[in-house]
Amino acid sequence: MERARKLANRAILKRLVSQSKQSRSNEIPSSSLYRPSRYVSSLSPYTFQARNNAKSFNTQQARSISVEALKPSDTFPRRHNSATPEEQTKMAEFCGFQSLDALIDATVPQSIRSESMKLPKFDSGLTESQMIEHMQNLASKNKVFKSYIGMGYYNTYVPPVILRNLLENPAWYTQYTPYQAEISQGRLESLLNYQTMITDLTGLPMSNASLLDEGTAAAEAMAMCNNILKGKKKTFLIASNCHPQTIDICKTRADGFDLKVVTVDLKDIDYKSGDVCGVLVQYPGTEGEILDYGEFIKNAHAHGVKVVMASDLLALTMLKPPGELGADIVVGSAQRFGVPMGYGGPHAAFLATSQEYKRMMPGRIIGLSVDSTGKPALRMAMQTREQHIRRDKATSNICTAQALLANMAAMYAVYHGPEGLKTIGQRVHGLAGTFSAGLKKLGTVEVQDLPFFDTVKVKCSDAKAIADVANKNDINLRIVDNNTITVSFDETTTLEDVDDLFKVFALGKPVPFTAQSIAQEVENLIPSGLTRETPFLTHQIFNSYHTEHELLRYLHKLQSKDLSLCHSMIPLGSCTMKLNATTEMMPVTWPSFANIHPFAPTEQAAGYQEMFDDLGALLCTITGFDSFSLQPNAGAAGEYAGLMVIRAYHMSRGDHHRNVCIIPVSAHGTNPASAAMCGMKIVAVGTDAKGNINIEELRKAAEANKDNLAALMVTYPSTHGVYEEGIDEICKIIHDNGGQVYMDGANMNAQVGLTSPGFIGADVCHLNLHKTFCIPHGGGGPGMGPIGVKKHLAPYLPSHPVVPTGGIPSPDKSEPLGAISAAPWGSALILPISYTYIAMMGSKGLTDASKIAILSANYMAKRLEKHYPVLFRGVNGTCAHEFIIDLRGFKNTAGIEPEDVAKRLIDYGFHGPTMSWPVPGTLMIEPTESESKAELDRFCDALISIREEIAQIEKGNVDINNNVLKGAPHPPSMLMADAWTKPYSREYAAYPAPWLRSAKFWPTTGRVDNVYGDRNLICTLLPVSEMAEEKAATA
């Protein structure tokens, strides 16, 4: 029996080995879609098992266990970098090189190759289990006190159904900005809910789909006021009752616009100068007071001054909406709607305004349109005002914002509904009122007399002494000055917490009552003239999903409409849609990281501070810089911060005249938009036929502006996906003419471990942690854009007015720039993601990631070059980590545009590559190191198949205007309609490739009509009656 079993096993092994050999002999890629064996790795687990078993059968003597076999099995790089060593060699050979290293040597210029990178602390990389233990250790060093600091940040309950099914769900957090509307209808609906929530609560008809934080939203509103008045008035007033971080950000931002910011008490505001473009007030004020701004706003308008109001969404469930008071623009944060404080972020901010100023709004806006069948569909509206189109003339440099957090806040409103939100608001207000009444009974301190919502202002003889007593009881209060404390309440506060506060403020005296005993005596303290009477959140969506089952199903319904990395690769060029590993994501929702106030004493955040120091050191090693600021909370914010640091450096040397920024025409639109925000004059330089910066044109521009040259903005590798051989010469030209080199870190995924911005010659660079370092894109945010600088720029890194910060490591001297973001360390809660990625990958893992990203791009380019022209390659015929295929010829031969190819890719189950940038009429493809060879082949096969579909049009076999590409994508509603008038079959429309039979992602709408949507702009949920009218009108 035993002998028969062995013989059977040997027969099976022999067949497996034979099959694997046959599969390897057929390895060379083919454009045919009907060879499924090609999608199986030549070294599949079965093959490995067969080889190992064969060896064990052929070995008759016992073997000792090697030390290597006893090492931990949960190493991370092999889980992140998809291509196996054998696949790497075969892919390199297919590209014409003997090995991966030979390909890299031919691709990355030797003049900029750096020595092997050696990371501090994590050179060898931690395993996943070691990393979790390390993060738990860091978390244990953070002390979560009960926070009453307020200032725009509050404790909140994150409903578990939202925590698990949205924040912790890769189907929600792994998508990019919804550029392909047909496969983004779920989060587009949720973002429309967010916009509706904002417009309802603020009383203004237009809202964007999130901004970075409240402080930067206020700065954007200030810029709007300047633009509305066409820059004719150059003073912006800020009431002293605004949050200090907001005031500081506006002051920093104003420098670039040549605006004068004046902070003044409300009672002292006047407009006699005739030079005031706008005024910012807080409602409720930073110290809690509620003021009636009605007459104030009328007076401002009488003098031609625009009014910006920073407000609190929860307060607006009880207060008269700012729009009804006459405010022109309303800004604020949605953080307390179910988003953790996270030591400062990420949180979704908002900006609402009137229809009159809609084209001057910053950020993404979601609007309603129709699809190809006339059915309502959503998409991003009014994109022509954004930076990727208008460049330096854009309303803002903002692109990535906070979509994931906006979705959380929107779902919080959906879950609670209007009545639930009112109840929470009334409860918070009642607790604050109870506390105020109790303090008056105690008589140990003086309580403010002005009306308040959630924040009680207390006058005392020694604020620090009271705060120290509170700290000993794990309570944080806000010290305003030596004699003033504020106490801000939130939805997590209980009556027992109020009793604890009474003990603190009793100053050693007994407390003869309880909060519960006096709560029933407390009345609504909001004046009748400021009490909200207008209903809000009346749409059915906000009144339907109030049980967990219902919200769970609603969340699942929406996520099912969106293609994410759960389904397939997202090959967007310049976006780096790589793996967001589970171990990296886990610490984000741990309470010890999530529930700390950004202005808590730093000793309570020792774990965070240790991580910041280590992360700063790691990033310095990776980039070749001397210091880092972690404050910028998006790539665009990093660009702006880096240029402002350069500006501050020139100013410190007396070079006030240096304001010229040279930018290649191929640069991303944020570059000129950011430079314009810093008050720089932009000089554009062209590129040559190979996609490189025209060095002679650059030299002439630099020399012509040598007395005024501030900076060059350059992306490396270039936006054309090429390592420019002359990058070191380019940096030298700028330095020789008195300028600084700003490197856009968008393509850092092709530098790590191979070269670095500092080694190349850059003076400052921002890193997109949401690209190279694995923070998920969240469907349009969050992001992080920390900036690294050389030593001479380190003194000018951003600081903060509440918690002083600067470079990491700290420079010898400091002349810091003002605040760039509302929180001292930006969106600190997501920094553990990048930290764990770097620590687990180690030096070699990170270097291998860069190499494999380059290999994957070259492999795909080689596969596609027979079917599509590949633009721009380096001197040895290779590309960097991304490449561009040229579709321009198809417009003449087949009437096909890049959009047609992108929409047809949806039918194949893929998100389209980046369209028509940096070259119009092209697609830019970036595969990343995280995609397997099988997935790369599947995408290539889809594009090759589409090329055959184009060929059928070119041959005249298919109508040029009515074909499968022009009709794409094909949702089930279209395919199952009674009438089918297309000249191709329903089956061909739906199943153009064999792999789709086993698993297919279905779009839920036909091609969306962007022009119709912009001409009939609707950016909120319509009431049911209006939806019926709209449907009838489109029909």
UniProtKB/Swiss-Prot annotation:
Molecular function terms, GO-annotated: glycine binding; glycine dehydrogenase (decarboxylating) activity; pyridoxal phosphate binding
Recorded superkingdom: Eukaryota
GO CC field: glycine cleavage complex; mitochondrion
Biological process terms in GO annotation: glycine decarboxylation via glycine cleavage system
Subcellular location(s) of the protein: Mitochondrion
Entry-linked InterPro entries: GcvP, GDC-P_C, GDC-P_N, GDC_P, PyrdxlP-dep_Trfase, PyrdxlP-dep_Trfase_major, PyrdxlP-dep_Trfase_small
Transit peptide limits: 1-64
Names of the cofactor(s): pyridoxal 5'-phosphate
Catalytic activity: N(6)-[(R)-lipoyl]-L-lysyl-[glycine-cleavage complex H protein] + glycine + H(+) = N(6)-[(R)-S(8)-aminomethyldihydrolipoyl]-L-lysyl-[glycine-cleavage complex H protein] + CO2
Family matches, as Pfam families: GcvP2_C (PF21478), GDC-P (PF02347)
EC number: 1.4.4.2
Residue numbers carrying N6-(pyridoxal phosphate)lysine: 771
SUPFAM superfamilies: PLP-dependent transferases
Keyword Transcription regulation: no
Keywords in alphabetical order: Mitochondrion, Oxidoreductase, Pyridoxal phosphate, Transit peptide
Family affiliation: Belongs to the GcvP family.
Subunit description: Homodimer. The glycine cleavage system is composed of four proteins: P, T, L and H.
Function of the protein: The glycine cleavage system catalyzes the degradation of glycine. The P protein binds the alpha-amino group of glycine through its pyridoxal phosphate cofactor; CO(2) is released and the remaining methylamine moiety is then transferred to the lipoamide cofactor of the H protein.
Record's protein name: Glycine dehydrogenase (decarboxylating), mitochondrial
Lineage: Eukaryota, Viridiplantae, Streptophyta, Embryophyta, Tracheophyta
Gene name of the encoded protein: GDCSP
